[in-house]
Amino acid sequence: MRLRTAIFGVLLFLQSALVVTGGAVRLTGSGLGCPTWPECTPGSYTPVPHQAEGQLHAWIEFGNRLLTFALLLSALIAVIYVLKSGRKDLRTLAAAQVLGILGQGVLGGITVLTDLHPLPVAGHLLLSMLLIAGAASLYSRREAPQF
């Protein structure tokens, strides 16, 4: 049970941390710090020296992208963990986390490629809120009896 608490707790923490770093991206004007997607700049997946967008903006955006990989790993661990449980509710919520994170990657790319058009930006935030709600539900159900 402690392992389940740790796995779901880390997932919830990382989902929340991603919203915080996404807010930092938005508040610092770093949304196009990496002006291409999936690469950061043409020909490089990481920021490059003397990047036109500035190193600070590039690294803020790149850091947000990197955190997504830690989050995806955490969600995959949660899926693997709940596969052996008999709890369909946990399996569904964990699988939705993985699918939602992958969807966030695509939506993040659309957001960059549309030069931060308000609709994909809003969709990106809305999906983040849904993913946090799902992670919170996983965490709150960690000790709930199976029905």
Describe the residue ranges of each PLM region.
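Membrane-interfacial loop-to-transmembrane alpha-helix junctions, especially the N-terminal start
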Residues: 4-8, 88-98
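N-terminal signal-anchor transmembrane alpha helix
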Residues: 4-31
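Helical transmembrane-bundle signal
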Residues: 12-22, 71, 75-78, 101-108, ...
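Interfacial helix-loop-helix junctions of multi-pass membrane proteins
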Residues: 24-36, 49, 102-125
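Extracytosolic (periplasmic/ER-lumenal) interhelical loops and adjacent juxtamembrane/interface segments
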Residues: 26-62
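Membrane-interface loop-to-helix entry segments
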Residues: 56-77, 119-133
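Transmembrane-helix motifs of polytopic, lipid-linked glycan transferases
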Residues: 71-94
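Structural signal for the C-terminal ends of transmembrane alpha-helices
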Residues: 79-86, 137-145
